[in-house]
Amino acid sequence: RLEELKGLRTAIEAWQLLGPDAPQLIVAGTGPLEAWAKENAPDTVTFTGQLPHGTLTELLAQSRAALCPSLCYESFALIPAEAHAVGTPVLASDLGNVGAAVQEGIDGLHFAPGNAAALADAVRKLQNVGETFDLTAMQQKACQAYNAEQNYRELMTIYREIMRNENS
């Protein structure tokens, strides 16, 4: 969703700071911030609208990086998980589950939430480091961390904690 809490404004402002040499940013989705974003985005930003999941996965696989500039504590960091599953590093705000899903310098880079200058610096760093991310390790991490068995174990841990709290 193109909304404040997802950090779209931070992304657009970072691309403004990067100037005409910025890499192409492709923004998928729709939402309340869409009109503002289109009005303020530099030419290096493209808006696709809503995409089918398969198309989005292909786009992630072809991308140099995925961007997750979230300004809120998300319950599950879906974009980093999907990006890592196809071997794409992630530029993520260092906040909550989004930040925790990225290991700095291993499978992506962090930046301060809501800080367009810090995001622009992370983009520049990504452009300068070349292909130094371990794509195989990213995919293995995603498969180990985001599978049905792991999700079941985590869910059962949460349920047990809830039951323990209700019985105290």
Predicted feature locations:
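Short acidic/histidine- and often glycine-rich active-site loop of Leloir-type glycosyltransferases
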Residues: 80-81, 94-105, 109-110
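Conserved acidic donor-binding segment of nucleotide-sugar-dependent glycosyltransferases
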Residues: 104-105, 109-116, 125-131
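Nucleotide-activated donor-binding/catalytic signature segment of Leloir-type glycosyltransferases, i.e.
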Residues: 35-55
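A structural motif in glycosyltransferase catalytic domains
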Residues: 11-12, 25, 119, 155
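Short glycine-rich donor-binding/catalytic loop of glycosyltransferases
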Residues: 71, 88, 92-99, 113-114
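A short, well-ordered alpha-helix in the C-terminal region of glycosyltransferases
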Residues: 107, 132-145
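A conserved mid-protein helix/loop that constitutes part of the nucleotide-sugar donor-binding site
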Residues: 1-17, 32-35
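Acidic donor-binding loop of glycosyltransferase active sites
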Residues: 61-75, 88
